[in-house]
Swiss-Prot record:
The gene is OPG088. Belongs to the glutaredoxin family. The keyword Protein transport does not apply. One of its GO terms (cellular component) is host cell cytoplasm. Pfam families: Glrx-like. The keyword Disulfide bond applies. Glutaredoxin necessary for virion morphogenesis and virus replication. Functions as a thiol-disulfide transfer protein between membrane-associated OPG128 and substrates OPG095 or OPG053. The complete pathway for formation of disulfide bonds in intracellular virion membrane proteins sequentially involves oxidation of OPG072, OPG128 and OPG088. Exhibit thioltransferase and dehydroascorbate reductase activities in vitro. This is Glutaredoxin-2. Disulfide bonds join C13-C16.
Length: 124
């Protein structure tokens, strides 16, 4: 069973689309799940299944810890049911305007280094 990369992006965001396209190159190693963050957090979105308290906590955590990320990536281990935050910002080159803005070697390293169960995310 492969680990899963969960990509939280925004609609109509070219950087998010380019990151998603670049990460697709890792699909032989990971299952990849793309999540539209706005639809996810809408009142009737998928996050509503968590209940109001957990949903509110999740929204608060996103706002407090991930608001400076254009796109967020988590890796998920379906066997242990643990998640880890992947610091994608280290792999991005914002001078590029296509999927090459993601340095896949750096991203792979960040995915491997991401520690399960650590929250809030440790960023350098």
């Amino acid at each position: 069973m492969k680990n899963v990369l969960i990509i939280f992006g925004k609609p109509y965001c070219s950087i998010c689309e380019n990151v998603s396209e670049a990460v697709e190159e890792l699909k032989s190693e990971y299952d990849i799940l793309h999540v539209d963050i706005l639809s996810f957090f809408l009142k009737d979105g998928d996050s509503s299944m968590l209940g109001d308290v957990k949903r509110g906590t999740l929204i608060g955590n996103f706002a407090a810890h991930l608001s400076n990320y254009i796109v967020s990536i988590f890796k998920y281990n379906p066997q242990t049911k643990q998640m880890a935050f992947v610091d994608i910002n280290k792999s991005l080159d914002f001078t590029k305007t296509d999927k090459s803005l993601v340095n896949l070697e750096i991203l792979k390293s960040e995915i491997e280094k991401a520690t399960y169960g650590v929250w809030p995310p440790v960023t350098e």
